[in-house]
């Protein structure tokens, strides 16, 4: 664009040309004016440039006069101000009137159209430059032609109202022109796309992209196109990013002296570097963006570099970042502190509420206790009964359980319950009414018993219920037992059976060991089996289920007294068997057999030695005296007596009989008769079988040795038949016995398989049954939540397959076999 019309001289400028670079309305109007005056550069101007000489005709319009320019003056530019439009500069009224009269001579349609831009353009004026009018009659001349174009399109498949193309993708409406708002260049006023264009082609075209790039470049119009410094790119760091990054390690406070000043020479790079601390050496590989105060190394030297200012700015930035981080930490700390204090306040509020409730409950409990103390006074008109006191304790246990557990129940029961309990049992006779008071004591056991074990009366932490029994009930029982006669055992045994579930283990042991056993021991010492009409087992055996092994010290003196009584005994006296028979299951097998061998077997042997065998007139009383002891005396002892004192005489009588022409039929009957006198258990013994088989052999030899002599007809056959019959019976008996043994073994196997213990408790129970040991739970007795059991006299509990036995001060684990040995 030519700017020569802006050069001129002012009156005060001393001939210095001034050029204004501002874009005026004249520039905008004549930029797109095809009829503007063009200045063609001459040869001289091309050669000499601005120093070329110009003719007066070639002078460009300017605001200055026609005087010649002073080229010796320095070049200077002055502001031209706001230039008026070219149409307003024409002030020659003659030329205007001439031009107006000339235009009126032309038709209106052929009048030259002025290019309207900006505010002079109206949307209603839809005319093109050059006089062509755009209206609905455009192309109407085609109505008077043959319309060959429309026909050709229809032959090619065109359908009116649809677009062109295979898929009718062409536009239907004609291209719509959009008039620019102002007088600027194309795109100066934004996108010039019409609504139809946007609808048909919604994709942004390259012109719009170029428009965006142009607007971006226009914002940097002050920079030179190809040189200068590029636009700086600013990176912004939000507070959230700074918090997330948490640059904790950068301390921008006053630099502290390092613990050790060490000079470090770094020769790992291309150049030798010296550091004065290990921290500086550790920061040498830091990323430039991460290290404080270190800028990015510039490839080109900076023309305007202020390192001190940059350092200070970076220092301010780091200090601000650290302040933000510290403030965030402080805020987080305060928020956490608020949360903690809130929780603490809630907890303290709950504690305060619980304490208030506890104070209220304790006040009510105290009032109730004071009321009970007032009513137990002798001068009270409404005395407290034991039933009412039990209901009060139940109410305290139900409504104020925590306070009831925390209270000293022992002191409370001593002060209130003991006087009432003494008054309740003052007229009671346990031997007459053994069940009296059991329901009352059962209720008080549930109210006062705490569950921990008390082992003796000297235990400092004695259970209140145990203390109640020990201090009130046991002294009363001592007086009753002191007057009790052991031979009248039934009332006392029934009484203890009724109270055993209410008595603690240690109190029951104390009663049995300190009160009952001494009375029994003294009575056994005074017992005389020869003069006493009451059998001793009648007043000793009722205590066996309860005392069990506690009575073993009494068995030895009882056996001694019985032995002394049997010294002058004869087997013909059957009373001895009646006295001894109840003790067979009480004494141990070894002690019982030893007692029989010492006191009974010699007497029976003496009777058998005096026994006379006479086939013609046999007396069986002596033999029956011996066989009656078969269940009392061991089988081996009975067989020994028969082998020693009976069968030698019996075989001798048989031989004598066979040597005197006997009647074999009578001998056979005699043989079978004696054999029927023995039980199957005795006959099954091998020694007894051998003796009877020996008798058969003697009979067979006697028959076979009498060849040629006179013999009873059929005797040999009869003896042979008897022999075969006896052998067959023995074989059948042995087979039957083997079958019974096999069946019993199978039954034991099935029973054992069916009785396989499911847990350790079942195993202990099965072992107790095998060894005849009482194994039963102690009702209401627990230790650390585990049920306590009574294994004979031993108190045990089971924990995860291990048996714990109660010792003197603690619980001791033990094996099952050791437990069985201890119980025996």
Swiss-Prot record:
Ranges of biased composition (kind: Acidic residues): 11-25
Main location (coarse class): nucleus
UniProt keyword terms in alphabetical order: mRNA processing, mRNA splicing, Nucleus, Spliceosome
Annotated compartments: Nucleus
Keyword DNA damage: no
GO molecular function, a single term: nucleic acid binding
InterPro entries: G_patch_dom (IPR000467), GCFC_dom (IPR022783), STIP/TFIP11_N (IPR022159), TFP11 (IPR024933), TFP11/STIP/Ntr1 (IPR045211)
Pfam families: G-patch (PF01585), GCFC (PF07842), TIP_N (PF12457)
Recorded family membership: Belongs to the TFP11/STIP family.
Protein name as catalogued: Tuftelin-interacting protein 11
């Amino acid at each position: 664009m030519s700017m020569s019309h802006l050069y001129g001289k002012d009156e005060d400028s001393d001939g210095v040309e001034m050029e204004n670079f501002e874009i005026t309305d004249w520039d905008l109007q004549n930029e797109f004016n095809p009829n503007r005056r063009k200045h063609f550069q001459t040869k001289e101007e091309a050669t000499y440039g601005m120093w070329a000489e110009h003719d007066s005709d070639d002078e460009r319009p300017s605001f200055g006069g026609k005087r010649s320019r002073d080229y010796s003056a320095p070049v200077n530019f002055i502001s031209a101000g706001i230039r008026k439009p070219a149409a307003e500069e024409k002030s020659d009224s003659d030329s205007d009137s001439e031009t107006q009269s000339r235009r009126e001579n032309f038709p209106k349609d052929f009048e030259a159209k002025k290019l309207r831009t900006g505010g002079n353009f109206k949307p209603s004026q839809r005319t093109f430059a050059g006089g062509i009018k755009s209206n609905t009659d455009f192309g109407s001349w085609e109505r008077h032609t043959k319309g060959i174009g429309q026909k050709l399109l229809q032959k090619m498949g065109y359908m009116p109202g649809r677009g062109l193309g295979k898929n009718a993708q062409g536009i239907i409406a004609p291209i719509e022109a959009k008039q620019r708002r102002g007088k600027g260049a194309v795109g100066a006023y934004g996108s010039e796309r019409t609504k139809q264009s946007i609808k048909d082609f919604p994709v942004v075209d390259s012109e719009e992209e170029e428009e965006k790039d142009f607007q971006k470049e226009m914002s940097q119009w002050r920079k030179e196109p190809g040189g200068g410094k590029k636009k700086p790119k600013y990176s912004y760091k939000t507070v959230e990013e700074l918090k997330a990054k948490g640059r904790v390690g950068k301390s921008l406070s006053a630099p502290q002296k390092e613990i050790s000043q060490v000079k470090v020479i770094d020769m790992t790079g291309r150049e030798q570097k010296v550091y004065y601390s290990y921290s500086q050496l550790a920061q040498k590989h830091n990323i430039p963006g991460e290290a404080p105060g270190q800028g990015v190394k510039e490839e080109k030297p900076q023309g305007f570099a202020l390192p001190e200012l940059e350092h200070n700015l970076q220092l301010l930035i780091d200090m601000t970042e650290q302040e933000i981080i510290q403030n965030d930490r402080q805020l987080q700390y305060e928020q956490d502190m608020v949360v903690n204090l809130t929780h603490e306040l809630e907890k303290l509020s709950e504690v305060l509420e619980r304490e208030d409730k506890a104070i209220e409950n304790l006040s009510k409990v105290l009032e109730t206790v004071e009321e009970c103390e007032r009513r137990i006074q002798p001068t009270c008109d409404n005395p407290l009964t034991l039933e009412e006191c039990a209901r009060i304790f139940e109410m305290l246990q139900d409504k104020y359980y925590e306070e009831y557990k925390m209270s000293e129940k022992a002191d409370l029961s001593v002060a209130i319950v003991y006087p009432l309990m003494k008054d309740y049992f003052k007229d009671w006779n346990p031997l007459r009414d053994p069940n009296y008071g059991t329901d009352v004591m059962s209720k008080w056991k549930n109210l006062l018993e705490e569950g921990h074990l008390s082992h003796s009366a000297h235990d400092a932490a004695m259970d209140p219920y145990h203390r109640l029994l020990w201090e009130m009930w046991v002294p009363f029982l001592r007086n009753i037992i002191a007057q009790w006669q052991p031979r009248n055992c039934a009332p006392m045994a029934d009484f203890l059976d009724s109270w055993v579930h209410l008595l603690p283990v240690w109190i029951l042991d104390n009663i049995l060991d300190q009160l009952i056993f001494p009375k029994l021991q003294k009575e056994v010492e005074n017992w005389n089996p020869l003069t006493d009409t009451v059998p001793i087992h009648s007043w000793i055996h009722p205590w066996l289920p309860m005392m069990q092994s506690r009575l073993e010290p009494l068995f030895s003196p009882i056996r001694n007294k019985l032995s002394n009584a049997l010294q002058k005994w004869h087997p013909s006296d059957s009373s001895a068997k009646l006295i001894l028979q109840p003790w067979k299951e009480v004494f141990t097998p070894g002690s019982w057999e030893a007692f029989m061998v010492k006191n009974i077997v010699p007497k029976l042997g003496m009777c058998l030695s005096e026994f006379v065998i006479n086939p013609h007139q046999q007396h069986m009383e002596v033999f029956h005296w011996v066989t009656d002891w078969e269940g009392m005396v061991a089988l081996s002892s009975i067989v020994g007596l028969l082998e020693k004192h009976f069968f030698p005489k019996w075989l001798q009588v048989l031989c004598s009989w066979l040597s005197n022409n006997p009647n074999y039929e009578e001998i056979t009957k005699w043989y079978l008769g004696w054999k029927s006198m023995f039980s199957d258990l005795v006959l099954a013994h091998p020694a007894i079988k051998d003796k009877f088989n020996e008798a058969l052999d003697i009979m067979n030899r006697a028959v076979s040795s009498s060849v040629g002599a006179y013999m009873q007809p059929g005797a040999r056959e009869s003896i042979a038949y008897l022999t075969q019959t006896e052998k067959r019976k023995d074989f059948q008996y042995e087979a039957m016995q083997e079958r019974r043994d096999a069946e019993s073994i199978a039954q034991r196997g099935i029973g054992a398989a069916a009785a396989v213990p499911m847990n350790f408790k079942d195993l202990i129970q099965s072992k107790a049954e095998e060894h005849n040991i009482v194994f039963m739970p102690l009702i209401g007795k627990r230790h650390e939540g585990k049920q306590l059991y009574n294994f004979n006299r031993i108190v045990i509990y089971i924990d995860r397959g291990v048996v714990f036995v109660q010792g003197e001060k603690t619980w001791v684990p033990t094996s099952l076999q050791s437990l069985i040995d201890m119980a025996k």
